[in-house]
Amino acid sequence: MKVGVEAIRELRQITGAGLGDCKEALETCSGDMEKAKVYLREKGLSKAYKKSHRDAADGLVAVRVEGDKGAILKLGSETDFVARNEKFRSLAAELVSSLLKHGAEDLSSFSASPYDGGSGVSVADEVVNAAAVLGEHIVLSGIGFLELGGPGVIGSYIHGAVGEGIGRAGALVALEATTAKTEALLEFARQLAMHIVAAKPESVSVETLSNDIVEREREIVAKQVEALGKPESVASKIVDGRMQKFFEDMVLLEQTFIMDGSTKIRDLLHNKGQDLGCEVRIVAYRLFSVG
């Protein structure tokens, strides 16, 4: 089948593969973008195995932390012009404050909850009202709410800030630590949130990474290694080695800390625990970005 130039360019942007390879992949996969990505991975032409955290054309991420609770959300817009609008920024700030105050299990329940801005409508209706005023489609596309169940801290970070707690990307991370909240622990949590924004992990640990993701990657790697024509014993070791590199990219505890370029996050937690005289553990994190 014939595929459009825009689809080829989009696939190239996602995968980093050449235009010709992207065209071949899309034609082979009948224009299916997801299948084309897998096709390129199997050919060893792409490393784009991470899902995107950037599904809005534009917009803002808003974060708020207060005590043992933290909230984060992504408010999408069609253009940067609207994302920079004061009403849009105010809406993002009001929504994340409401999320922090009331909490929510998921996007659906939060959207159905009353809007705190005094208009007497639901969160979803207020977003629709804002879209009518601003003149383009606006969507509340993701939320995250973390609350500590014991001693610890919640850290946050905003990248590309355009206001307090509002920017182009953001993360929350909850740390469990059996010690008093100190400036050192809070700063450590902030640094971890900064790392999460930059490194974009898919899970905290190997055990919590989706089995479907792991098995799909193992199948792709096995096909890549099979093409090398190595003996089975050698091929098996190559597959294991490539899977370890996969985990080091996808899993937070296996990643290398961006601020020193050498220490694994799991070792960083151990070292910080020794400094503080207690165990420090990552309970959960939330990450969003736009643009």
Swiss-Prot record:
The record, for Gene3D superfamilies, names: 1.10.286.20, DNA helicase RuvA subunit, C-terminal domain, Elongation factor Ts, dimerisation domain
One function term, GO molecular function aspect: translation elongation factor activity
A Pfam cross-reference name: EF_TS
Q: Which cellular component terms (GO) are annotated to the entry?
A: cytoplasm
As for subcellular location, the record says:
Cytoplasm
> Which keywords describe this protein according to UniProt?
Cytoplasm, Elongation factor, Protein biosynthesis
Q: Residues annotated as region Involved in Mg(2+) ion dislocation from EF-Tu?
A: 79-82
- InterPro entries documented for this protein: EF-Ts_dimer_sf (IPR036402), Transl_elong_EFTs/EF1B (IPR001816), Transl_elong_EFTs/EF1B_dimer (IPR014039), Transl_elong_Ts_CS (IPR018101), UBA-like_sf (IPR009060)
Question: What family name appears in the similarity comment?
Answer: Belongs to the EF-Ts family.
| Role this protein plays | Associates with the EF-Tu.GDP complex and induces the exchange of GDP to GTP. It remains bound to the aminoacyl-tRNA.EF-Tu.GTP complex up to the GTP hydrolysis stage on the ribosome.
Q: What is this protein called?
A: Elongation factor Ts
Which gene produces this protein? tsf
